[in-house]
UniProtKB/Swiss-Prot annotation:
Annotated spans, N-acetyltransferase: 254-452
Protein's name according to its UniProt entry: Bifunctional protein GlmU
Gene: glmU
InterPro entries (alphabetical): Bifunctional_GlmU (IPR005882), GlmU-like (IPR050065), GlmU_C_LbH (IPR038009), Hexapep (IPR001451), Hexapep_transf_CS (IPR018357), MobA-like_NTP_Trfase (IPR025877), Nucleotide-diphossugar_trans (IPR029044), Trimer_LpxA-like_sf (IPR011004)
Cofactor-binding details, from the entry: Binds 1 Mg(2+) ion per subunit.
Originating organism: Rhodopseudomonas palustris (strain BisA53)
Residue ranges of the region described as Linker: 233-253
Amino acid sequence: MTSRTSLTIVLAAGEGTRMRSSLPKVLHQVAGETLLAHVLKAAPEGDGAALAVVIGPDHQAVAEEVGRVRPQATTYVQRERLGTAHAVLAAREAIAAGADDLLVAFGDTPLISAATFARLRQPLAQGVALVALGFRPADPTGYGRLLVQNDRLVGIREQADASADERAIGLCNAGVMAIDGKAALRILERIGSANAKGEYYLTDAVAIARELGLEAAVIETSEDEVRGINTKAQLAEAEAVMQARLRQAALDAGVTMIAPETVFLAADTTFGKDVTIEPFVVIGAGVSIGDGAVIHAFSHLVQAKIGKNASVGPYARLRPGTSLGDGAKIGNFVETKAAQIDPGAKVNHLTYIGDAHIGPNANIGAGTITCNYDGFGKHKTEIGAGAFVGSNSSLVAPLKIGAGAYVGSGSVVTRDVPDDALAVERNQQKVSEGWAKRFREAKTRGKTRPAK
């Protein structure tokens, strides 16, 4: 198998009108990745594995996603949407290059696995010319049935054309197919459009292969793996299946999740050893969590790196570009963005840290705000090692607070603070003795304010 070359053609030209969205269907997301990205990542890769993606004429965003996920892939445009076989032949140039195995998949099936693609190719190495992927849905209504005799696929019958006996067959066509590369164009170019819609259907390839004296077979997989996404409801169903997979994989890897069903992960989330995730945590794309870290309840993380033995939350929001050092702490109702928080630093309560670098073992008091935006651009705040910022302070960037410096509570700091210095910016406190007593007496007599 490893010596056989392959070409995977992913069909992604559909409009997806039932999604009721201006976004192309294959660019909707499951577990922080587009539907298309999931399929592209599952397709064979490495030496001898080519990849082609067929897109619509107005799908530049889809082409860009292909380039982001699999830069070596080639895109082809299906200018008229005339059926699945017509879409495959949009990549005729790639097919003609003569890979040993041709795989045809769909860009809206995010749950398909690399293992399934590998199983689909195995019969080709044994001389079978065409392999269809089948599944057994709980309700087969509407699906084409796979007709099998003596362990060989003899046809695909659409629901509308099936006899009563054929409709009783539980094995259905998933649409995914593997074809011997040497026979692929011979089969595909014989597919006609003599049907009610005047389209070219890939399912006709089975009958044509048999007419040519070639063998066809079936490989079965689960219904979940081949879920196609056509509506927002189906998108939600696929998300649920993917989340269940990701949670189980995390648990198997040793992550402690107190209530797994309340935790949402991304497809690329990575965990170290002895990580604990409390209930109602949402982890978006691009998050890595180091050994011994704890993510407390109701926290939300996206594109963030969490160091060893660090603590996040509860009720924390870590936005893209956050890097939390070993043993650092982000407490409750703290938001960070583009922030490097070094080992041992603490940001414990009610704070916004954006476009900032906080040095090792610095302490940021409750209610501190980095004022990073002046209405036109973002500016950086740098806080040195061991610095202490008192509660309710506003740090107006660009700003540097030196190592070991102190900022008095309630200060609005607009100028740099040297190492080991104290910065205090607030009005002098005024105390009027007896004022409160006079105020109460005045109110009692009906006056509005007491004498000063």
